[in-house]
Amino acid sequence: MTTARIFGIGRHRLTVDGEGVTTLVTFNGCPLRCKYCLNKTSWDMDKGRDYTPESLFEEVKIDQLYFLATHGGVTFGGGEPLLQKEFIKEFRALCGPQWQIVVETSLNVPFEIVEEMNAVVDGYIVDIKDMNPEIYLTYTGKENTLVMKNLEWILQHGDAKHIKVRVPHIPEYNTDEDVAKNVEILKGMGVVDIDEFNYVIR
């Protein structure tokens, strides 16, 4: 039986995490250690509770009418949702193609996971952090080689309209010039939906 630790389920999110009305499901577990992480709960596997795909489906299907009427569905975040690929695949089999399934991801996962999941999900929200390898490493504690490889691949094998890339201004880590360069590179790669924003430091 597939299980995953989930620390949050947020209902009735309108156009924040994808099209229409969505429910945001946040998994524990993340390969990054971002300095300004907003979901540090995801680092602690003792927080939250365990779900099976079936128990999660039973909990969130209360909003099915909203999902169908607005072309919404479930967005999986975290933490890093792509680390829970079997869970998401089984959940997709339960909800069927009518619900939109989106992953909010760093893409800092093995390429094989992205390749396998591309046919399962309907869209991506990619938190790119910064495309400069040195800035990325300093801010997250990890290299961004996998991120770049995976982003290039999903742009080649998916629908760019369903790939949103979030580009943050990160205080003390990148500059406005860095962000402008990130946006320029992303446009050159074929990204059409770019969300530039300021990190809020808690």
Model-flagged regions — what are they?
Residues 1-45, 62-70:
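N-terminal [4Fe-4S]-dependent radical SAM core
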Residues 48:
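Conserved H-D interstitial segment of serine endopeptidase catalytic domains
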Residues 61-65, 70-73, 77-78, 82-202:
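Conserved AdoMet/S-adenosylmethionine-binding subsite of the radical SAM
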